[in-house]
Every structure is written in C-alpha cells, then in structure tokens.
Regions:
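Solvent-exposed, non-transmembrane regions of membrane-associated and secreted proteins
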Residues: 21-213
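Hydrophobic H-region at the start of alpha-helical membrane spans
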Residues: 10-22
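Single conserved hydrophobic/aromatic residue that forms the stacking wall/gate
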Residues: 1-8, 12
Length: 213
C-alpha cells in the first residue's frame, strides 16, 4: 500500500543518513587526530629547543680562516653587522638549535623562523623536488593539516635571493601562520617589528615594513 511504501522509504532514508553521518564523523575524526598528532610533534620539537636555551650551543658559527686576512675581514664584517643591530636597539633572541637533532627529525629542515609576539616559532623546510609537498604533509610524513612552514626550491636555502617566500597555513586554532593577523593591529605592528631566521651558519634579522591580507 502507499502508506507502507512511504514508511519503508523513510526507514531507508534514515539508514542512508546514518551511514553518511558515520562516514563524515570518521573522516573528521581522522583529520582531527592527524592534526593533533602533528601539533604534538611541533610542541615536542619546540620544547626540545627551549630545553637547550641554557646549554652551550654545539653549533657555533664557523668563520672561514683560509688566511689571516680573510679571517680579519670576516670578523670585521660580523662586527659591523652587530654594531648596526646595536644602533637600532635590536637584541637577537638566543636559540641554541641542535641541527643534528633537527635533521634527525626531518632531513628537509634547514632553518628556523621566530616572530616575537606571535606563535610563529617553527622549523623551515624545503622539499628537494615537490614544491607543494609540505602544504599537505607534516614533518613526520603524515598527510594532513597543519603541514609545515616551507619554501619552494626556487629560493636559496642561504636566503640570498631578493625575495624569499615562506609558506604556512592560516590555521583556525591560531597555530602556524594564523597569528600573523596580529599585525593588522597598528600597536602590535609597532611593538613587534622584527622577524628572526636562524640557519646553521647565521642569524638573519628582517624588519617588517608592511603587513596586509
């Protein structure tokens, strides 16, 4: 009868809806777990770096010393750069990064970016062949959010290019590059004007002159 047919149809629809909801919950649950585990990896890595802050840095900058003259020139250049920073009142935050351990976590880690006042305190990676790899993959190789902070292979790992583009997700939980939105506030912009990039050989200081979306 039409009534029985309608009732059977309603039961079928409810069953289909239940299956769809279960599938959606599984997908979102898996995505949430991947993101949570990846964030734990970052927190663990940051904790390891912080634990080293009061220890002696086992990776002091090695100045080339092929000749006495070359050594003196390099030392003079470093002293000049330090003097310029002092004149601007810039004090570089100390990060005793253990590059051997960082490479043990992921061979593609080649720098560390730190922006005071934000949550940006992460390793920087560069995949040797796939520019978008770390958009979708985490440091431990799992696929999903939050991915990694990374540059494309067109940019030098020495940060010698005229422009270096650093990529990172705008996460809703305020991790990765989400906290850069703080620079929409002029007071915050004025209070935190510098970006620090650490490599095995040097520390680079960038002054922020503009922020927009």
């Amino acid at each position: 009868t039409p009534i029985k047919s309608s009732a059977a149809s309603d039961v079928y629809k409810r069953q289909v809806l239940a299956v769809v909801l279960i599938v959606v919950l599984i997908i979102f649950g898996r995505s949430w777990m991947v993101q949570k585990n990846a964030q734990k990896e970052y927190e663990k890595l940051s904790a390891q770096v912080n634990d080293l802050q009061n220890q002696v840095n086992d990776n002091q900058i090695n100045i080339p010393s092929d000749t006495q003259t070359e050594t003196e020139n390099v030392a003079q250049e470093v002293q000049t750069e330090d003097s310029e920073l002092e004149q601007k009142g810039i004090e570089i935050p100390q990060k005793n990064l253990n590059w051997k351990k960082l490479k043990g976590v992921n061979q593609d880690i080649y720098a560390w970016i730190y922006i005071p006042g934000t949550g940006v305190d992460y390793p920087v990676l560069q995949h040797p062949s796939d520019d978008s790899y770390y958009l979708n993959y985490n440091m431990n190789g799992t696929r999903g959010y939050p991915g990694c902070i990374y540059t494309e292979k067109a940019n030098s790992k020495e940060f010698t290019d005229f422009d270096t583009v650093v990529y990172g997700h705008n996460m809703r939980n305020d991790t990765m590059f989400a906290s850069l939105h703080n620079y929409e506030d002029q007071t915050f912009f004025n209070n935190f004007p510098y970006i620090y990039v650490y490599t095995k050989e040097k520390v680079l200081v960038y002054e922020i002159f503009a922020a927009y979306k």
